[in-house]
């Protein structure tokens, strides 16, 4: 059942708050790593294992739990996962040993994937024209939840110890479960006629079938690895001499990141206008540039502030754009697309967490910054390579060519003989051929080329007078 009216602002806001609260549970530990290490006599050089196990749990949840959103009633699944999250948080708050702490962290990560079920559910409920805006608002809620989690956790730790934030979050999560049960729209969509195992396998099938998902998933791995290289070990230089900041002061840097994340919300609008690729490129460049001021952390906290804002602005702009792009690919598989994409996000976060603390133990803060900058550079290069690669066109959308001409455009339906089933009848633009070139059925448009659709082996016209290769519609 397709939505026939847009989601209200209040419901979108509830989705955003619920996502922010759920994902914040994963990040409370970041400014508290030194306190946890002291409480359980853990080596500070390996304390990153707490974040890594949480991200591993998150990755397992993405693979095993998120696809259930395409099989089961999403509303009930969301409420159940939220209730179980409250129990996992209580386990952390009452942990008597590091073993129970790590188990609670892994379970918290596993159940925090309710965030992605919420995102996919919101995308299903939204009308196509508001996909980018809805995803942008909810993603901003997620990011603000991540960043404010650090701030609130730091303040609570100074006031009442590191366990207090988990007790508070358990109570808030329980209240949110009740709100979601009362407010979430009752929406039933067609369910795939497949078993759970086949559904999980279809996540990997989507990677084979959808190049956009593959490209954006790898970008997610690299960008979130770079971000976690900053956030995981940041507490170590800030809490040590000569800075010796308190947990509250360390957590305040999360507010700086929140400012950058909120500014990235507009990336969804740009993606809706077809500017997703170039938004991604500019954002990746910002991420790379951010490591220069971050490297000056121990001599200037203002430089760190600038770097944090820039890094999170770039990170979230890429993230919002990627989600908007992949959700447009296969509307009937929103949860599985989310699972596949966010699985790479989780892998990148886990690798960045464990790698950054190891680099800090080996070479200090400068080594951490070199690692983060290197990963950001790889992400930028990868984006450029995928942009330069020649990819098939999609029905009704111009390919990625330079706009050297402004040809006359004829607007009409995309021919059924050309388009895949999901796109038949979709609006299309056809470039008018020059005088003497007969119009051929099934053409697609480009700004400077007149070409037939895939499977139609007829000559094509191009401004240079050459024969264009048939392109898939």
Sequence positions of predicted segments:
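Juxtamembrane intracellular "pre-TM" segments in multi-pass secondary transporters
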Residues: 2-5, 185-217, 403
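Intracellular juxtamembrane helix-capping segments at the cytosolic ends
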Residues: 114-126, 317-330
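Helix-loop-helix hairpin linking two adjacent transmembrane segments in secondary transporters
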Residues: 137-182
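Conserved MFS/SLC helix-loop-helix module at the cytosolic interface between two early adjacent transmembrane helices
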Residues: 60-98
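Structural signature of the two symmetry-related core transmembrane helices
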Residues: 76-90, 170, 278-293, 373
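C-terminal transmembrane helical hairpin of 12-TM major facilitator-type secondary transporters
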Residues: 277-322
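Cytoplasmic helix-loop-helix junction between adjacent transmembrane helices
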Residues: 104-141
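Helix-to-loop junctions at the C-terminal end of transmembrane segments
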Residues: 62-73, 262-276, 360
């Amino acid at each position: 059942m397709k939505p026939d009216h847009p989601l209200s602002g209040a419901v979108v806001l509830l989705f955003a708050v619920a996502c922010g609260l759920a994902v914040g549970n994963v990040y409370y530990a970041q400014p508290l790593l030194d306190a946890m290490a002291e409480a359980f006599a853990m080596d500070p050089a390996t304390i990153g294992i707490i974040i890594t196990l949480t991200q591993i749990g998150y990755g397992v949840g993405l693979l095993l739990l998120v696809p259930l959103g395409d099989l089961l009633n999403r509303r009930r699944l969301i409420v159940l996962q939220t209730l179980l999250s409250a129990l996992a948080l209580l386990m952390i708050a009452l942990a008597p040993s590091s073993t129970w702490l790590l188990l609670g962290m892994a379970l918290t990560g596993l159940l925090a994937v309710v965030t992605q079920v919420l995102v996919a559910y919101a995308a299903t409920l939204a009308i196509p024209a508001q996909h980018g805006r809805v995803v942008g608002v909810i993603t901003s809620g997620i990011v603000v939840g991540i960043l404010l989690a650090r701030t609130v956790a730091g303040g609570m730790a100074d006031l009442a110890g590191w366990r207090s934030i988990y007790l508070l979050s358990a109570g808030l999560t329980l209240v949110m479960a009740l709100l979601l049960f009362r407010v979430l729209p009752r929406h039933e969509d067609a369910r795939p006629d497949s078993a759970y195992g086949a559904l999980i396998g279809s996540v990997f099938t989507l990677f084979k079938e959808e190049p956009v998902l593959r490209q954006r998933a790898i970008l997610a791995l690299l960008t979130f690895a770079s971000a976690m290289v900053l956030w995981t070990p940041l507490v170590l230089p800030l809490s040590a001499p000569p800075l010796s900041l308190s947990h509250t002061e360390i957590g305040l840097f999360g507010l700086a990141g929140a400012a950058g994340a909120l500014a990235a919300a507009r990336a969804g609008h740009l993606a809706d206008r077809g500017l997703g690729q170039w938004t991604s490129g500019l954002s990746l460049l910002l991420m790379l540039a951010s490591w220069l001021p971050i490297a000056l952390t121990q001599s200037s906290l203002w430089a760190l502030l600038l770097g944090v804002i820039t890094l999170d602005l770039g990170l979230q702009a890429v993230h919002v754009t990627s989600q908007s792009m992949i959700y447009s690919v296969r509307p009937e598989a929103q949860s599985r697309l989310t699972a596949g994409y966010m699985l790479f996000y989780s892998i990148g976060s886990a690798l960045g967490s464990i790698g950054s603390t190891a680099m800090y133990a080996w070479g200090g803060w400068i080594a951490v910054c070199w690692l983060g900058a290197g990963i950001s550079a790889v992400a930028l290069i990868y984006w450029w390579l995928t942009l330069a690669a020649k990819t098939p066109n999609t029905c009704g959308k111009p390919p990625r060519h330079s706009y050297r001409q402004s040809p006359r455009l004829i607007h009409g339906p995309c021919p059924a003989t050309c388009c895949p089933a999901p796109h038949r009848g979709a609006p299309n633009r056809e470039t008018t051929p020059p005088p003497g070139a007969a119009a051929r059925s099934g053409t697609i448009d480009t700004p400077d080329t007149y070409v037939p659709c895939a499977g139609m082996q007829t000559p094509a016209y191009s401004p240079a007078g050459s024969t264009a290769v048939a392109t898939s519609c």
